[in-house]
Amino acid sequence: MGIEGVLERGVVTTTADKLINWARTGSLWPMTFGLACCAVEMMHAGASRYDMDRFGVIFRPSPRQSDVMIVAGTLVNKMAPALRKVYDQMSEPRWVISMGSCANGGGYYHYSYSVVRGCDRIVPVDIYVPGCPPTAEALLYGIIQLQNKIKRNYTIAR
C-alpha cells in the first residue's frame, strides 16, 4: 500500500520514537564554532548555493538555542575550556560535528605544543568530516549522516 492508501483512510501509524526523531532531523540548529580556515567553508555551506535551510539547518548564535555544534578548525589549548563550556551550555540532546583535519586530530599543526590533537579529547564527537579544509559538500554530507544517526536513536525507554 502506497501513500495514496494511507491518505484515503486518513490514518498514519508510527511509533513515538520515529516521530520524535523525524522532528529532530528536520530541525537541526547548529552553533558555529569556527576556529580557522574550515569556518570559511562552513559559511560557504550556509550560503544560498547549498541552501542548508531545506534540511532544516538554521545556524544559531547561542549555545542555548542550538543542538548541534560544528567545531571547524584548529583547537588550541587556550580555547579548549571555552569549547567545553559552550558544549555544557547546550541543552540535551546535543551532537557534535568535527570538521577538518585540525579538529579531527590536530592536522598540519599536530606536533605543536599548543594544539589539542582532536576535539574529541574535550567533547564527545558524533560525526567526523575529513579534509583540509573539507568542502561545503563534505559538511553537507556530514549533516546528512548526522540525520541518519539521529533516526536510529531510541528516545523512549523500553
Curated annotation (Swiss-Prot):
Keyword terms of this UniProt record: 4Fe-4S, Cell inner membrane, Cell membrane, Iron, Iron-sulfur, Membrane, Metal-binding, NAD, Quinone, Translocase, Transport, Ubiquinone
Cofactor: [4Fe-4S] cluster
Membrane topology, record value: Peripheral membrane protein
UniProt-annotated binding residues for [4Fe-4S] cluster: C37, C38, C102, C132
Class of enzymatic activity (EC top level): translocase
PROSITE patterns from the UniProt entry: COMPLEX1_20K (PS01150)
Family annotation (Pfam families): Oxidored_q6 (PF01058)
Co-factor binding comment: Binds 1 [4Fe-4S] cluster.
Record-listed E.C. numbers: 7.1.1.-
GO molecular function, one term: quinone binding
Cellular compartments annotated: Cell inner membrane
Reactions that this protein is recorded to catalyse: a quinone + NADH + 5 H(+)(in) = a quinol + NAD(+) + 4 H(+)(out)
Classification via InterPro entries: NADH_UbQ_OxRdtase-like_20kDa, NADH_UQ_OxRdtase_20Kd_su
Predominant localisation class: membrane
Biological process annotations from GO: aerobic respiration; electron transport coupled proton transport
Gene Ontology CC, one term: plasma membrane
Family to which this protein belongs: Belongs to the complex I 20 kDa subunit family.
Function text: NDH-1 shuttles electrons from NADH, via FMN and iron-sulfur (Fe-S) centers, to quinones in the respiratory chain. Couples the redox reaction to proton translocation (for every two electrons transferred, four hydrogen ions are translocated across the cytoplasmic membrane), and thus conserves the redox energy in a proton gradient.
Subunit structure: NDH-1 is composed of 14 different subunits. Subunits NuoB, C, D, E, F, and G constitute the peripheral sector of the complex.
UniProt cross-references to PANTHER family, sorted A to Z: NADH DEHYDROGENASE (PTHR11995), NADH DEHYDROGENASE [UBIQUINONE] IRON-SULFUR PROTEIN 7, MITOCHONDRIAL (PTHR11995:SF14)
Protein's recorded name: NADH-quinone oxidoreductase subunit B 2
Organism: Nitrosococcus oceani (strain ATCC 19707 / BCRC 17464 / JCM 30415 / NCIMB 11848 / C-107)
Taxonomy of the source species: Bacteria, Pseudomonadati, Pseudomonadota, Gammaproteobacteria, Chromatiales
